[in-house]
Amino acid sequence: MDLYAVWGNPITQSKSPLIQRQLAAQTHQTMEYIAKLGNLDSFEQQLLAFFEEGAKGCNITSPFKERAYQLADEYSQRAKLAEACNTLKKLDDGKLYADNTDGIGLVTDLERLNWLRPNQHVLILGAGGATKGVLLPLLQAQQNIVLANRTFSKTKELAERFQPYGNIQAVSMDSIPLQTYDVVINATSAGLSGGTAPVDVEILKLGLAFYDMQYAKGTDTPFIALCKSLGLTNVSDGFGMLVAQAAHSFHLWRGVMPDFVAVYEQLK
């Protein structure tokens, strides 16, 4: 049976095995998908051994996306620009192909929410790895992006890298332009420690819809809770993005595009 896995550290919390099994059942694909704990010191050796033993592909989650990218032989454009991958596929010639389906997963989920139209103004909070993975698909969807981060130099470097692909402006967190934002996306990891991005609530009040790339089972993420406390109710966490990026990885491996909304509805 074709073997796939998700690699991360920690990994016990991962929903990927559950999601991928649902996608396989829906599309009548016979495959095994397991969670693998990556060793922080010897991840590269583990991953290469996994493929040498016959595995067909895998997902990569924190903290290994950049390290896995370095092991690949060929890359999609979106993985190359992000310098990180969340998906690897073993090609027929034995080479490893890296892709990054995070951004197309986000775009697909924004479409599900009916929050994506051309020429919108999108504010992204945070300029870390999560942001790098989503910028190209958002720009390809003709979104005008304001990218805000506490460290301006990091934001500026990222904006310059993606400028050839669309309209993107770098600002520091305390100099975000006062204008209406069709979608505000939280791409910071502050929620993992119970905090929120250091953004002025007056800026948030200018938003029309709010998306947190994090998700929390059975409760609101800190960012969603903050939005609701301000009376901003057009909100979504990132669980739909998680299912959608999984569906795009599945499509790369199996050549079949699942109905991600049906699986999202089953699992949410």
UniProtKB/Swiss-Prot annotation:
What does the subunit comment say? Homodimer.
| Record flagged with keyword Oxidoreductase | yes
Classification via SUPFAM superfamilies:
Aminoacid dehydrogenase-like, N-terminal domain, NAD(P)-binding Rossmann-fold domains
The residues annotated as the active site are K65 (proton acceptor)
Entries under Pfam families matching the protein: SDH_C, Shikimate_DH, Shikimate_dh_N
Any one annotated GO CC term: cytosol
EC number(s) from the headed UniProt entry: 1.1.1.25
Q: Catalyses which reaction?
A: shikimate + NADP(+) = 3-dehydroshikimate + NADPH + H(+)
Q: Which keywords accompany this UniProt record?
A: Amino-acid biosynthesis, Aromatic amino acid biosynthesis, NADP, Oxidoreductase
Show the GO MF annotations: NADP binding; shikimate 3-dehydrogenase (NADP+) activity
**Domain of life according to the entry:** Bacteria
Asked whether the keyword DNA damage is assigned, the reply is no
What name is this protein filed under?
Shikimate dehydrogenase (NADP(+))
Top class in the EC scheme: oxidoreductase
Q: Which family is annotated?
A: Belongs to the shikimate dehydrogenase family.
Please give the Gene3D superfamilies that the UniProt record associates with this protein. Answer: Leucine Dehydrogenase, chain A, domain 1 (3.40.50.10860), NAD(P)-binding Rossmann-like Domain (3.40.50.720)
- Function of this protein? Involved in the biosynthesis of the chorismate, which leads to the biosynthesis of aromatic amino acids. Catalyzes the reversible NADPH linked reduction of 3-dehydroshikimate (DHSA) to yield shikimate (SA).
**Could you tell me which pathway this protein works in?**
Metabolic intermediate biosynthesis; chorismate biosynthesis; chorismate from D-erythrose 4-phosphate and phosphoenolpyruvate: step 4/7
